[in-house]
């Protein structure tokens, strides 16, 4: 009996998409095939597609069954606890091993045979879901065990000590005799607040933040600094000047001398009383030196009183100097050389 609903194929037969062919039609296909009828003739006679007939006959020749679906039920489970244990062992020995290498080792070690060995995708799923978390946890535990104890952090700006309630309280605690006292800045390092301002980074804290009720000393506030002047400091003794003895000052004044040519430290010279610098005389670059050689060589090494800046060797330069050509100068030099020889 054909179903009342379905679709019609090219041969005019009715079929339901996604449903297997009824067992009666399957059995009829096998019987006709045993009678020697060709699959194409069976397809036309029963109005079943040629692909369906070929598939049913091929399955019957392989398994001897005409039932649809897998033969023998579902595939037996291959990811047994023993297989998972061996996979974990292989992964721990070689963390960089691949899934196909694990599959080959399972076959080589005899853990599985070719029928129940897990596929590469199954081994990858086992490594990801069952062994991955355990491996990471084991590495984390071993890292925590082998990790050295953290070193005590160096306190920020530990060289300078700052007044704080903790150090003040620590300073009040008496120390037993014979035990050296520990400074407050070393015994209790300063704890900075969780602020990231410039003053906190540079170690400059406001004095108003450091005032504590338990501190025995009075810390001036920022507002009080402006009122502090020279009048608040105790006056010096009459025999002392700025906190120094008069005798020491007189002794230093007695042996202190000002450099030659320079005014004293306490005296000032006005700019108007100083004469301007003398302007140097302009000398032409084309001026020739016409002094006698004997006057230049035999002259003394110091400047004469009657000499001028232009004639330091007491030899006068004529007022009117004529420009001589280069040829005349060369001829004169040649004549002097010849006469000297």
Swiss-Prot record:
For this protein, the DNA-binding region equals 4-130
The disulfides recorded in the entry are: none
Q: Nucleus among the record's keywords?
A: yes
What ranges does the record give for the region PAI subdomain, renumbered to this chain? 7-63
Stretches the record annotates as RED subdomain: 82-130
Record's keyword terms, sorted: Developmental protein, DNA-binding, Nucleus, Paired box, Transcription, Transcription regulation
Q: Where is this region: Interaction with KDM5B?
A: 168-189
Q: Per the record, GO CC terms?
A: nucleus
Q: What's the protein here called?
A: Paired box protein Pax-9
The source organism is: Callithrix jacchus
Write the gene name. Answer: PAX9
């Amino acid at each position: 009996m054909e179903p009342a609903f379905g679709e019609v194929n090219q041969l005019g037969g009715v079929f339901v998409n996604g449903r297997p062919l009824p067992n009666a039609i399957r059995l009829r296909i096998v019987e006709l095939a045993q009678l020697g009828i060709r699959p194409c003739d069976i397809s036309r006679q029963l109005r079943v597609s040629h692909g369906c007939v070929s598939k049913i006959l091929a399955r019957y020749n392989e398994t001897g069954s005409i039932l649809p679906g897998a033969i023998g039920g579902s595939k037996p489970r291959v990811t047994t606890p023993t297989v998972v244990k061996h996979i974990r062992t292989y992964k721990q020995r070689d963390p960089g091993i691949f899934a196909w290498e694990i599959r080959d080792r399972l076959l080589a070690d005899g853990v599985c045979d070719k029928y129940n060995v897990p596929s590469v995708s199954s081994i990858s799923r086992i490594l990801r879901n069952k062994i991955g978390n355990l491996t990471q946890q084991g590495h984390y535990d071993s890292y925590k065990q082998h990790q050295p104890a953290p070193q005590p952090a160096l306190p920020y700006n530990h060289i300078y000590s700052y007044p704080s309630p903790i150090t003040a309280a620590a300073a009040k605690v008496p120390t037993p005799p014979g035990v050296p006292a520990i400074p407050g800045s070393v015994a209790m390092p300063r704890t900075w607040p969780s602020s990231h301002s410039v003053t906190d980074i540079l170690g400059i804290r406001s004095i108003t933040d450091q005032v504590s009720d338990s501190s025995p000393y009075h810390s001036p506030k920022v507002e009080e600094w402006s009122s502090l002047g020279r009048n608040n400091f105790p006056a010096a003794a009459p025999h002392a000047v700025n906190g120094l003895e008069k005798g020491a000052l007189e002794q230093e004044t007695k042996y202190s001398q000002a450099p030659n040519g320079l005014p004293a430290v306490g005296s000032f010279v006005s700019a108007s009383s100083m004469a301007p610098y003398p302007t140097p005389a302009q000398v032409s670059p084309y001026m020739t030196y016409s002094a006698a050689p004997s006057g230049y060589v035999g002259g003394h090494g110091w400047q004469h009183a009657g000499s001028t800046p232009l004639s330091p060797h007491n030899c006068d330069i004529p007022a009117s100097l004529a420009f001589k050509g280069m040829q005349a100068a060369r001829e004169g030099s040649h004549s002097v050389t010849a006469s000297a020889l």
